[in-house]
Amino acid sequence: MSVLCAVASVGFVMSASAAEQTMHGNLDEVVVEGRADVLPGGMASKEASMGILGNKDVMDVPFQTTTLTEKTITTFGGPNQPLQSVLINNPAVRSVGTTLHNDFSIRGLKSTGSSLYVNGIPGLMTQFWAPSYIAEDIQFISGPNSGISGLPSSYETSSAGGIVNFVSKKATDNDINRYKQTFSGKSSFGEYIDIGRRFGENKEWGVRINTEWLDGKTAIDNHDMEAQGIFANIDHKDDNSKSNLLMGYRHLNIEGGARWFTLKNANGKPVSDITKVPSAPDAGKNYGIPGLAKEAEGYIFALNHEQKFADGWKWFANAGYNYNKLNRNIIGASSNFTIINDKGDIANNLMSTQTVTKNYYAQLGINGQFKTGDLEHDVTLAADKAWHSIKGAKDMYKDGSMGSVAGNLYNGIYGVGVWFPKIEPGLSSKDQYWGISLADTVKYNKAQLLLGVHKHAASVDSYNKKTEKVTGHVDSNAVCPTYGFVYQPDEHVSMYASHSENFDKGSVVSGTYENSGEILDPAKTKQNEFGVKYENAGFVTSLGVFDITQSNNIVVHRDGYSKDFFLQDGEAKYKGIELSVNGKLAPKWNVMGGFMYLDAEQHKTARGTNDGKAVNGVARWNAVAALEYQADDNFSVIGRGVYVGKADIFNESLQVPSHMTYDLGVNYKTKINATPVTFSAMCYNLTDKNYWDAHTGNGLILSNPRTFMLSAQFDL
């Protein structure tokens, strides 16, 4: 709770600066050194990316928004750290994943890497494959927002909890010739090259290239990570148009590193042999067996263009493509290991999977700004379409035929009769979406009114992977309204209220459940929110109160079946308070963080069995505070504390304990033979705490051990 107190004491202090970047529909301005939208301290930006509405000042937005800058991404996104290590700097986000699974929650609702946007385009990342080093900003809008984000394109989760958008690095006005070496874990070495140039008489063309090479052992025993990647961003800007093309390839291979566990259950409750959550074991040990691995490669293309055609009017187009192949995924059945008693004994069959995904996306829209009397209008009309297909392993051998694992959390895990068969993929599902969005922001004096509506239809087919014949089909459609109101009594204060919604496609149950291939009804998520924002003197504080209602998909056990069922059984309500603070706290002191209080309850469950009980795996308290001391222009120290409260699982039968972790780092800038060099040292999980994170649902995620990271960056 110490982080909660620290963040609350910062509270409503002061704030500064202005903004302008992008998400869906409007392209970024060319980035220059010393961006005006970045708050003092450089850890966050004062801009708010609002989907098809383009770029908005955070004070003009009727939602909670956060933008993490490249400084924050680099500081907390170490080579061996999961993506969530960066994302949790937003107090609405909680980590529920590992390096094997880019899983996280926003306001208690699960998301994965596959629900991320890149330059406003959905479906370009995956649960396993989401490189953060390509991003100059990571932007968040908390809460469901189909009305401004358009169509989803994810085979695992929707963006019901909020929108997370990666903004790719672009060439700056100054040439970039950057080489960076890293060392982390036990023997993990990384090399990163970053080159940027602008060309043309007015520097209208820009090229930015980022490469990655990473290989070696992490801080976890027998946990190897290998990655190679190259990404190129080409942009063009003149008086009447802006264009951006991002393209790239990445290969990622991880040996070992299993951290996801479940508890054996019966009829939705733990079996009699489990009376408590076992204490977290040594996080530095590997809880897999030799041969367990995950390896994938993928390509992405993202194209954005906007063109002025009249005074105050422009049209825009966005398109994206992602191909990703998970070549190997050898792990325990259901992607985790099962704890069967209080002693921490393990029993699991193994499985081997292969997944091939393809995503296509296209959007066309028009935006106009005009007046009707004293009213100022900013109107956007956009239509989009998305296609998605997935192939999965025809036979995953999770019936025990490829072997099993046994052992104990505290004494070691071993394999029994293990062999690794050849895996062939077969068509698993195909999705198509069609959507249209209309929004108008009306401004009058100190007030703004947002009125928007999104209509979309989805067609989902599931297939027998062995025969590739259709086994299920569902068509769905929905209208999602969005409306909000902002009133600014003076230049420092902004009060807002809003309503927003999200509607998913109707999901195909994954192969880890007994009802694999079944299509669940589309789940609708609705949010009402109001809040206040304050900015002054280099500091921004934002407080929001929200109420979210979502159709509740839950895991259910039935007697006579070896695996659980995944069913839509009722409704969940998430009521909470979110506070965020960013900027310069005092001379030489910068701060970023906040807290979230979340009361998540189940409603309308089968036979009322679990009505009023906590949503499984959702912590009531969540807080983060990052504090930086800049002694001078060359030396700084940064620390971060993260607190996650207790979380109920198995319908309040068990409870995952709270935990508090700390990170600490230093940066020193100097010159070697006239070459600017930045030396950095970072320690993640400073106290080497062993703890469980409650996975959304009834799972447990084991922490990563204390990890040191050293780097040297040369600006040639």
Residue ranges and their predicted role:
Residues I176-R178, T182-R259, L263, G291-Q307:
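Transmembrane beta-barrel wall of Gram-negative outer-membrane proteins
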Residues I134-R178, K203:
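A beta-strand signature from Gram-negative outer-membrane beta-barrel systems
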Residues K446, D547, L567-N651, T687, ...:
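Gram-negative outer-membrane beta-barrel transporters
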Residues T357-N359, D374-H388, L427-Q550, Y574, ...:
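Structural signature of Gram-negative outer-membrane beta-barrels, strongest in the C-terminal barrel
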Residues K646-D648, Y668-L716:
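C-terminal beta-signal and adjacent terminal beta-strands/loops
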Residues T67-E70, Q84-N89, V96-I148:
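Periplasmic plug
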Residues M1-G78, Q84-N90, L245, A362, ...:
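N-terminal Sec signal peptide and the immediately downstream disordered periplasmic leader
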Residues E306-A310, K314-G320, N324-I330, M495, ...:
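Membrane-embedded beta-barrel scaffold of Gram-negative outer-membrane proteins
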